[in-house]
């Protein structure tokens, strides 16, 4: 970067990635494989993934539920945070995405602690075993977030943590918007704030993925 060039969020992300994450062949290969399979580029960033990993480790999560696998990038981070004795159940609607994720998880050396469940999450959630869960990460179709959170509360232990991605939508949650995802994000935050079984907050984020954020809630 030249002396006269102002830093921007993607530049800062690049610095943080090189400084705090470093080279990680398994993660790089997971992203490359997802691109090769033409999966949408909507995975969490490396910093967000590292946050999930550290959060899982900090609360000693041994049973993790993920709703929305995509290519398994965030799943790898969650599995690392849960550790060798942990178990991650990840739900994915698209069979193609699940296939890519399974290969990525195997390459990353965490496939033995991850179960990939294929199908609409609202159909598979009632069938899940392996709970109660210590940590739930929701990053799927936004219009069903409220239903996913309701299921997360049922399946989680008291004191568990629920994380919901993409809840700021570039500030779209404040606008009179035709964006269904922004409307869903606002409804999600309102539900989390009003639910007697949750104590919630939200953090805005900025980086190469733009202006967004995540909600975090403790199950009471």
Curated annotation (Swiss-Prot):
EC number: 2.1.1.6
Residues binding a divalent metal cation: 139, 165-166
GO biological process, one term: methylation
Reactions that this protein is recorded to catalyse: a catechol + S-adenosyl-L-methionine = a guaiacol + S-adenosyl-L-homocysteine + H(+)
Pfam annotation, one family: Methyltransf_3
Gene Ontology cellular-component annotations: plasma membrane
Main EC class the enzyme belongs to: transferase
UniProt-listed Gene3D superfamilies: Vaccinia Virus protein VP39
SUPFAM superfamilies given in the database record: S-adenosyl-L-methionine-dependent methyltransferases
Single GO MF descriptor: metal ion binding
Residues given in the record as S-adenosyl-L-methionine binding sites: 44, 66, 68-69, 74, 92, 121, 141
UniProt-reported outcome of changing residue 142 to A: Retains a low but substantial activity
Key words of the record: Metal-binding, Methyltransferase, S-adenosyl-L-methionine, Transferase
PROSITE patterns: SAM_OMT_I
Ways its activity is controlled: Inhibited by EDTA.
CDD domains for this protein: AdoMet_MTases
Cofactor(s) listed: a divalent metal cation
Similarity comment text for this entry: Belongs to the class I-like SAM-binding methyltransferase superfamily. Cation-dependent O-methyltransferase family.
Assembly description: Homodimer.
Function: Catechol O-methyltransferase that can use various catechol-like compounds such as gallic acid (GA), 3,4-dihydroxy-5-methoxy-benzoic acid (5OMeBA), protocatechuic acid (PCA), 3,4-dihydroxy-benzaldehyde (DHA), dopamine, caffeic acid (CA), luteolin, quercetin, and 5-hydroxyuridine.
Protein name per the record: Catechol O-methyltransferase
Species of origin: Mycobacterium tuberculosis (strain ATCC 25618 / H37Rv)
